[in-house]
Amino acid sequence: MKKTLSVILSLILIFSVVNLGGITAFAENETITDGDYSYRLLDDGTYELLSYDGADTDLIIPSEFRGLPVTVLGVYSCGLCDNLTNVVIPDTITSIGSQCFKKNPSLETVTIPQSVKEIGEGAFSECPSLKRINIENLAVWCEINFGDQESNPFCFASEFYLNGKPLKDVEIPSSVKKISNYAFYSAPIETLKIPLGVTEIGIGAFVGCKNLTSISLPSSIKSIDRAAFMECTALTEVTIPKGVEIIDEFAFYKCSGLKKVTVPSSVTSVTISSFNSCTSLEELVVLSEANLEFGDLGSTALTIYAKSGTPTESYAKANNIPFTSLLIGDTDGDGSVGISDLTLVSIYLSGKGELTSAQAACADINEDSTVDAFDMFYIDKAIYA
């Protein structure tokens, strides 16, 4: 009798396990609702948040469901939440879907963890009240795959915080090799220092950074991509380092406060829109002898400085722009390299005088964007050669 009962119980258990397995398999492809949240089990054994239908003002998105991590915020999953003002995203999330937070009219603050690797198109579109963005890791932020400009919350936000501290002066970490497209789109930063090792500034990386007054670029950069610094209206001076080869279209478009630009000898490509509508430009120093297309720069107070006989001289004359010939080492512009040039550099290095952009370009013999004792040595050598 006991043996028969044991067999029956075993059969019941087997059928129960088979039945439960069927339910689990079915659930993997279905929406699971738990209170205000709906989820979907992904192939990798983690969950995607499909929707949030609550009315909270402060939302801390769950980091797990049924003991498994939530790694994806789905398309439009947290949109149309009229009351939502503050969102904290957990450090399990790696992907924020397209239009995830779209049309949240009251949203003011978002905290984004360093686990996030991609943010889809329009993730923060139509969030007009967005004010403050908190991030944890600047290097990771630089490398996030942003779908477009409105996937970056800086499209609307006016305050940038790194680990709870306001960030206005940005120094890119040395581990970064490329600054992603739209990484700092419209960010409220004031100064920018990019270290040696970064090779590319992505499309629209710093578009509309209207408070940005100073940028320091390394010689490791090969390309300044399309619209990288477009509409950075507070920039007044840019020295592009030797090593840059391509300045893509709209790179400095509508930088209306820009007065001085130095283009190094390494540059082989400039488009007609790269510096278009830089209406305050006064000094354009071109050390490159390549055939560069400057287009309509939009300034009436401009003087171009370049070597005689170059395509840049032809461009200046064809467009009735005042032109001054450059001779490397000829800091005082008298047409020869002599003691007076050495004296001028010495006065500058002692802190008792200044150099114009053109003078600095002539004095910076090795084109390292710095006039220093090495340049004095080269000038001295040229004088007594």
Predicted stretch roles:
Residues 4-23:
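Sec-dependent N-terminal signal peptides of Gram-positive bacterial secreted proteins and lipoproteins
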Residues 22-38, 55:
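Low-complexity, acidic Ser/Thr/Pro-rich repeat tracts that form intrinsically disordered stalk/linker regions
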Residues 75-77, 97-100, 120-123, 148, ...:
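Consensus positions within tandem repeat domains that build extended binding/scaffold surfaces
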Residues 145-150, 296, 311-320:
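Short, aromatic/basic amphipathic alpha-helical patches
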Residues 36, 42-45, 54-71, 81-95, ...:
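Structural signature of tandem-repeat unit edges
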Residues 150-156:
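Short mixed-charge
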Residues 19-25, 326-385:
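Cellulosome-associated attachment modules in secreted, modular CAZymes
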